[in-house]
């Protein structure tokens, strides 16, 4: 039995997230159906994370097992003929039998786009969070920096997924403005449910003056979800970089992309 890893990119607007859900369109189900048509048997595709409904991926890693002998270099072209235009497989390669797209991943990066202008731009609909009130990116960076390090992130997660621990390590959280577009890039060894979106909401809260950047440490210590900022809309959030190192496989799937 071969274990095949896939690199994908997709727009999440028309899907209820990655994870298969009964009677709802999801990215995983769509990919599984395409794989089954190519390899000639049903497959289970394991993804690197459960992206929420409406969240996009500039890079995403999944794996599945198959008895098919189709060469890996042909798989992307074959699969893409059976996938909709908003999901694309960019690479396929064989990995060792114990490789797991989520378990072997050691770091993830999400990028959040905020379109900060008084006028909407139709080309950013579902691609960036439209926010008409001016935001000071310097204050946002000061707030974002408070999240860096190893902390209990229970205050910036939504209840919905059971986890053994809410402690995570954030390696960087960078804020950059180019014209009306503000980009937030956050990298961690893992993310809790809605954690990236709640962190972005907290950073915006600080820019609005609703909390002070230096208060974020105490908010994290409190574990109180209501003390942090809101969970922002999903349309501006993208998975953009993944790091793998399980002692055998070591590679990255990444994109330096911003609009």
PLM feature spans:
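Structured-RNA-binding interfaces characteristic of tRNA pseudouridine synthases
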Residues: 1-259
């Amino acid at each position: 039995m071969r274990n095949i890893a896939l690199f994908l990119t997709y727009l999440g607007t028309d899907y209820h997230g990655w994870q298969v859900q009964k009677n709802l369109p999801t990215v995983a189900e769509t990919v599984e159906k395409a794989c089954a048509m190519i390899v000639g048997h049903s497959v289970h595709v394991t993804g690197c994370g459960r992206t929420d409904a409406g969240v996009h991926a500039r890079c995403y890693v999944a794996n599945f097992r198959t008895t098919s002998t189709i060469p890996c270099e042909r798989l992307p072209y074959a699969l893409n003929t059976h996938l909709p235009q908003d999901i694309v497989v960019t690479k396929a390669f064989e990995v060792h039998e114990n490789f797991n797209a989520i378990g072997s991943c050691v770091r993830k990066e999400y990028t959040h786009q905020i379109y900060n202008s008084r006028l909407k731009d139709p080309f950013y609909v579902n691609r960036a969070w439209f926010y008409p009130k001016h935001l000071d990116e310097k204050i946002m960076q000061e707030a974002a920096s408070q999240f860096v390090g190893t902390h209990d992130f229970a205050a910036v997660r939504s209840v919905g997924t059971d986890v053994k621990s809410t402690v995570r390590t954030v390696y960087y959280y960078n804020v950059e403005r180019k014209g009306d577009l503000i980009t937030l890039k956050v990298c961690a060894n893992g993310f809790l449910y809605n954690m990236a979106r709640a962190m972005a909401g907290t950073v915006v809260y600080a820019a609005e003056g609703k909390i002070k950047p230096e208060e974020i440490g105490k908010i994290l210590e409190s574990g109180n979800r209501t003390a942090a900022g809101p969970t922002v809309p999903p349309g501006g959030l993208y998975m953009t970089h993944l790091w793998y190192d399980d002692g055998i496989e070591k590679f990255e799937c990444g994109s330096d992309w911003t609009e």
